[in-house]
Every structure is written in C-alpha cells, then in structure tokens.
Amino acid sequence: MSKLLVLLMTTALATLAQAISFDCSDKPPECQNDPGCCFDIGITTF
C-alpha cells in the first residue's frame, strides 16, 4: 500500500514538473532563461 502511495506521488510530481516546463517553453526567451520566472508562471497557471 505504501509503495503505491509513493508511486502515485512520484507520478503527480513528474506531471507537475512537466506542466511547469510546458508553460515555460511558451514564454519569451528572456523568461525561459530565468527559472524563477518560469516557475512562478507555472505555479500561477496551475
């Protein structure tokens, strides 16, 4: 049961990271070079 929970959390984190990366690639180049900018926008969109 605990292994299943870990797998679920890992999948959720990977999905979230992918969503943030996707949002970042959508932004202007000067924003893409700034992880803080990308991360901020990703969280806001999410």
Curated annotation (Swiss-Prot):
GO molecular function, one term: toxin activity
Protein name per Swiss-Prot or TrEMBL: U-limacoditoxin(6)-Dv61
Tissues and organs where the protein is expressed, per its UniProt entry: Expressed by the venom secretory cell of the spine. The spine is a cuticular structure containing a single large nucleated venom-secreting cell at its base. It is an independent unit capable of producing, storing and injecting venom. On the back of D.vulnerans caterpillars, spines are grouped together by 50 to 100 to form scoli, of which there are eight in D.vulnerans.
Compartment list: Secreted
Record lineage: Eukaryota, Metazoa, Ecdysozoa, Arthropoda, Hexapoda
Superkingdom of origin organism: Eukaryota
Keywords assigned: Secreted, Signal, Toxin
Function: Probable toxin. Does not show insecticidal, antimicrobial and antiparasitic activities. Does not induce increase in intracellular calcium in mouse DRG neurons, suggesting that it does not induce pain.
Main location class: secreted
Homology family: Belongs to the limacoditoxin-6 family.
Listed GO CC annotations: extracellular region
Signal peptide span: 1-19
